[in-house]
């Protein structure tokens, strides 16, 4: 079964977003006057999954090893362009004012970067006319037809992995040692544009220096625990915090987060 698509310039996909960025894209976004935030979640990682577990391998490659008390976890850091209302690059006529250097996630839309998220037009913000059969074929049986889209997806996936050591260093630069439990929410760090740009620049320098001095791969760097560093897992649900305490993990409610960190929860807060 095939899906046809053509952008109608409706602007629906350019409002109220958190757009995942590579670190290089984040610096461009900041240069253009936009806001960049750091999202962090933590995945308990007691054992290495089987080699044929593709989904776990995908998560693993985009995260770094850490400890929360005595619980091994993988920290998944995500740098995003954040805006409420229209994108700061959206022009009055609904054209993109940064079209030539827009983020790769924007370039591939409505395709999915994550290979484990099925392509579903119903999950997109595009209006029905965008999917009419008179337009070119966009996707056939889960495969995207356009070679440029394929290339941008591959480059986006590559940067997700290649940026991990620098994102780890970014957490260090911003003093981040708290993350939301995976599938419950995110800890969001909002240091401001100048502070974020300086932190990203320092993180990139630190990661490059570390890689050169240690002569290790990005994968090896992401798998090394930081001695003496323990992450606190944030949850707005008491039952989750109790469960984490049972496995000797460090946990806390969102109120424990320091400024400028915030909690975005996927579930209602519960103290029971």
Predicted regions mapped to residue ranges:
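Short loop/turn segments that flank or connect secondary-structure elements
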Residues: 1-272
């Amino acid at each position: 079964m095939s899906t046809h698509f053509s952008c109608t310039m409706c602007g629906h996909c350019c409002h109220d977003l958190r757009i995942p960025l590579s670190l290089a894209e984040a610096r461009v976004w900041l240069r253009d006057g936009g806001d960049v935030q750091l999202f962090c979640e933590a995945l308990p990682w007691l054992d290495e999954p089987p080699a044929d577990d593709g989904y776990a391998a995908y998560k693993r490659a985009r995260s770094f090893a850490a400890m929360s008390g005595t619980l091994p976890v993988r920290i998944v850091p995500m740098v995003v362009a954040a805006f409420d209302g229209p994108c700061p690059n959206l022009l009055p006529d609904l054209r993109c004012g940064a079209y030539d250097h827009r983020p790769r996630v924007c370039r591939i839309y409505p395709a999915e970067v994550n290979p484990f998220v099925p392509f579903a037009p119903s999950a997109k913000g595009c209006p029905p006319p965008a999917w009419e059969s008179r337009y070119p074929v966009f996707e056939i049986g889960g495969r995207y037809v356009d070679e440029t889209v394929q290339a941008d997806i591959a480059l986006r996936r590559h940067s997700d992995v290649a940026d991990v050591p620098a994102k780890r260093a970014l957490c260090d630069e911003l003093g981040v040692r708290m993350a939301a439990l995976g599938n419950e929410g995110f800890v969001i760090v909002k240091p401001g544009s100048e502070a974020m740009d300086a932190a990203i620049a320092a993180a990139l320098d630190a990661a490059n220096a570390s890689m050169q001095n240690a002569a290790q791969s990005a994968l090896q760097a992401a798998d090394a625990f930081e001695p003496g560093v323990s992450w606190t897992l944030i949850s707005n649900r008491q039952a989750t915090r109790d469960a984490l305490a049972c496995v000797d993990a460090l946990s806390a409610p969102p109120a424990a987060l320091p400024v400028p960190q915030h909690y975005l929860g996927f579930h209602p807060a519960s103290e029971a």
